[in-house]
Amino acid sequence: MVGQLSEGAIAAIMQKGDTNIKPILQVINIRPITTGNSPPRYRLLMSDGLNTLSSFMSATQLNPLVEQEQLSSNCVCQINRFIVNTLKDGRRVVILMELEVLKSAEVVGVKIGNPVPYNEGLGQPQVAPPAPAASPAASSRPQPQNGTSGAGSTVSKAYGASKTFGKAAGPSLSHNSGGTQSKVVPIASLTPYQSKWTICARVTNKSQIRTWSNSRGEEKLFSLELVDESGEIRATAFNEQVDKFFPLIEVNKVYYFSKGTLKIANKQFTAVKNDYEMTFNNETSVMPCEDDHHLPTVQFDFTGIDDLENKSKDSLVDIIGICKSYEDATKITVRSNNREVAKRNIYLMDTSGKVVTATLWGEDADKFDGSRQPVLAIKGARVSDFGGRSLSVLSSSTIIANPDIPEAYKLRGWFDAEGQALDGVSISDLKSGGVGGGNTNWKTLYEVKSENLGQGDKPDYFSSVATVVYLRKENCMYQACPTQDCNKKVIDQQNGLYRCEKCDTEFPNFKYRMILSVNIADFQENQWVTCFQESAEAILGQNAAYLGELKDKNEQAFEEVFQNANFRSFIFRVRVKVETYNDESRIKATVMDVKPVDYREYGRRLVMSIRRSALM
C-alpha cells in the first residue's frame, strides 16, 4: 500500500520549497490549535510513506472537511495547493489550501508502511529501514484502486479557485524601506512573537479618517482590511502614520507591508477573521506590488438571511442578497454631534425567501442605485434586534454590487428563474407595511390560525386575498373631534356645540369616523377583522363624511352601500395580536391596509406556489 503515497514528497517540500507538486499523503493525526473566537485551525501529522512531518497546517476553508470527519486520521488525500512558510528560525510550515480526500479513514483503516519522522535539521530525510524480503508478493506495489473521489474536494469560500487565487504564493523576497530583504509570509502565519516579517496583501477596504480630541490634543486614525491567499487581517494607522500612508494606499491595490505591531484583535469592531490585528508604527513600510493577479479580493463568510435570527445583537456578519426593493434617501440629524446624515433602507432577499432590512448611511445612502435589482455582498454589517432582525451597514463595512463570485451567480440565476415572483417573508420590522410595500408575508386564513400567528409577545403581520361576506353596520360610525390630529369622540351638548374632552374645547361641528367590523373569508377559513377609517372607506367605496350624511338623510341608500360591498374581494394587510380582557384571551385582527386584487399578479403567485408544492 506504500505505493499509493508520493514517497519523497515531504523531503522535496522541506528541502526545495517545491509548491508545484500535488503529492498524495496520508493523515496520521489531527489536532486543533487554539485560536480564540476565530474559526479553529488544525495541525496535521502527515506521511508520504517514507517520512512523517507534523508541520502541516490547514487553512480555515478546509475546516468543514475536518468537522464532517472526511479529513481524519488514516485517510489518504491529494494536496492540490499549498504554501510553504519559512519561520525566522529557519523551520518551514506547510499551509494546506486545497486538498481532495481520495480514500476515507474507514477504507484505509491503518497507517500505511513504516514511515519515520523527517528530521529537518539534518537537511536530509530519514529513510525507513527496508522490510525483510519475505516473499516477492510482499515487495510488489499494488496499483491505486479506482475508488470514488471523496466529497473532500474544496472550493474557496467566496471565489472560484481558478478565477481568484490563481497560482500558489510560495516564499518570495521583497525589499523593505531599510534596503534589507525579508521573506514574504502568509497573513495566516502572523503572530505577535514575530519581529521581522513582510506580507503581500490586497487592500479590500479603506476607511475614512476619523478624528477626535482628548487631553493629548487632536488625534486621528484610519483602518484597512488586507487579504492574501491564506487569510485576512485588519490594520490601523494613527496620527503621523495617517499623514504618511493615507494618500498612498488605494483600495484593491496590492502592497508589501512590513514591520507593523501585532496585537490581539478586538472582535467587537471588525468582521475580519483573524485573532490578531496590525497597527502601523514608525518602522512600518508599505511598498506597491506590481504582480497582483494571484491575490484574492474581499473574503466573505456569508450568513444566510434566515440564519440572522440566530445571531446575537451587535454581532458583525457578511451577507449576500438581491436588492428586492429600496426606499428613497432621507436626511436625519445625529443627536450626538447634531450633524445631518443621509439614511436609506434597502431590502435584501436570498434563496431562503426571507427578506432583511439593511440601512445605508451617508455617502453609501446617497449614491446607492437599486433600480436593476443588483446582487449585493456586504462584509461586516451589524445585526440589530429592533422589531425583528435588521442590518446596519457601517463605515467599516464593504459593499460590492454584483460581485464576481459563485454565490452571486447562483443567487442571480435563482432570482431570475423564480425568486422575482416571490414577495418574501421579512425578518425585520413589518409595521411600515413590509418591503417597500412589497413584502407582504402571504398567508391563507387557515394558515394564520394553524400557525398560531399573533400568539407571541409581538404582533404578527400578514396579507391575504379574501372576500367580504358580512359587514356589521351597527355602531360603525361616531362623531369625532373636528381637529386634524384628534379623533376623540365628542359629546353632544344639546345646544349646537360638541365637546372634545381630550382637547378640552367645544366645537360647532364634528367629523364622522368609522370603526367597521367585517367578516372576511377565503377558500378555507373566515376571520372577523376590525377596519378603521381608511380601510373601511376602501371597502365601502365611499368616504365617512358622505356616509354620515347618507345615514342621517337616506337610510335605504345607506343600507345599499353596505349591501354592495358584500362579496367583493380585496388584498387585506392584517395585524394580529392576542389580547386579554376580563381574564379572557382572544386574537384581535386589525386591518392595516386594503387594496384591490391584481389578478394577473395573484395568478402568477398561485402558479409559483403550485410549482413549489410540486417539488416537495
UniProtKB/Swiss-Prot annotation:
DNA-binding residue intervals: 197-281
Statement: the UniProt record of this protein carries the keyword rRNA-binding: no
NCBIfam families with a match to the protein in the record: rpa1
Gene that encodes it: RPA1
Protein name (record): Replication protein A 70 kDa DNA-binding subunit
Per UniProt, location of the Glycyl lysine isopeptide (Lys-Gly) (interchain with G-Cter in ubiquitin) cross-link in this chain: K22, K88, K163, K167, K183, K220, K244, K259, K267, K331, K410, K431, K458, K553
Biased composition range(s): Polar residues: 146-155
Region (Disordered): 121-155
